[in-house]
Amino acid sequence: MRAPGFWHEPAGVASTLLAPLGALYAAGTARRLRTGPRVRVDVPVICIGNINAGGTGKTPTAIALAQRLLAKGVKVHAVTRGYGGEVEGPLCVEERTHTAKQVGDEALLLSAFLPTWVSTDRQAGARAAVADGAECLILDDGFQNPALAYDLSIVVVDAWRGFGNGRVIPAGPLREPVEIGLKRADIVLSIGPDAAQQRFATTWGRHIAVPHLTGTLQPLPTGLPLDGLPVLAFAGIGHPEKFFQTLRSLGADLHATHALADHQPLTDTLMIRLLRDASMRGAQVVTTEKDAVRLSPEFRAQVMTVPVRLEVDDWGPLDSAVDKVLGR
């Protein structure tokens, strides 16, 4: 499902008419958070979440944070519900044996970097990770889930889109009002280029009373140069156009783009159609790292993947906060 366009436009007729439903949604979120058990486990828990529905860069943030913790010698595990997967868990994901259909694409991608537990019951997932030797947990997308207590919360936001029209689902893109959500945040990380960061700071900066980090998603080099390469690109992520723009910035000659729904299954029928279309155009099929893990092996070899990694302008405030919860 694609987000309605009016979510990211100044409040108009549609968002105003839907505002009462948004108020009910916000009340439900507040009640769930207020009455949740907030169980504490025996190791520090770092929550990476957002206030917006949809993609904001949580997975690249989790990967980058995990790499920093692992470099410090911390045995860090990820706990996620495995959105889009079939497994209830708790299950430690094996990158080479599990599929995105079983555990979800985000969990499968995370498992390439750190031990990752899928569990619809986050408490059970956390306990399983601790029993397996985890010294610290990264809780993926748990900001509005009251099952676990966490020691540090990082709210990730797309700098271009910000908090949209500032209204709650279905009137806008938010899971809860900005001023309420940010009161629970310890750090805000906005991701995007300089122009987007300036726009975000101008529009939303006054709402942020905690350390505000900025960063960008930078593509990693691939074996095949993209400059001048004829490309048919597809992406089933929160904001596909960001990926297409990344390809353009690398010099790719985009002959066609296909914006799929977030987490959309990549069926044989769909992939055969895309590959046939690319062949007729003399183009290379290119996709994101998160989409690539949903491909079956027979198609994965025919599709070029462009991975991205988070680069933060100043890790200092986050490093200090992490060291504090780790007792260092």
UniProtKB/Swiss-Prot annotation:
InterPro entries, per database record: LpxK, P-loop_NTPase
A Pfam family it matches: LpxK
Any one GO CC term of the record: plasma membrane
Positions annotated to bind ATP: N52, A53, G54, G55, T56, G57, K58, T59
GO biological process: lipid A biosynthetic process; lipopolysaccharide core region biosynthetic process
Top-level division of the source organism's lineage: Bacteria
Keyword entries, A-Z: ATP-binding, Kinase, Lipid A biosynthesis, Lipid biosynthesis, Lipid metabolism, Nucleotide-binding, Transferase
Annotated catalysed reactions: a lipid A disaccharide + ATP = a lipid IVA + ADP + H(+)
Broad enzyme group: transferase
Pathway: Glycolipid biosynthesis; lipid IV(A) biosynthesis; lipid IV(A) from (3R)-3-hydroxytetradecanoyl-[acyl-carrier-protein] and UDP-N-acetyl-alpha-D-glucosamine: step 6/6
EC number: 2.7.1.130
Molecular-function GO term, any one: ATP binding
Function in brief: Transfers the gamma-phosphate of ATP to the 4'-position of a tetraacyldisaccharide 1-phosphate intermediate (termed DS-1-P) to form tetraacyldisaccharide 1,4'-bis-phosphate (lipid IVA).
Family affiliation: Belongs to the LpxK family.
Protein name: Tetraacyldisaccharide 4'-kinase
Gene that specifies this protein: lpxK
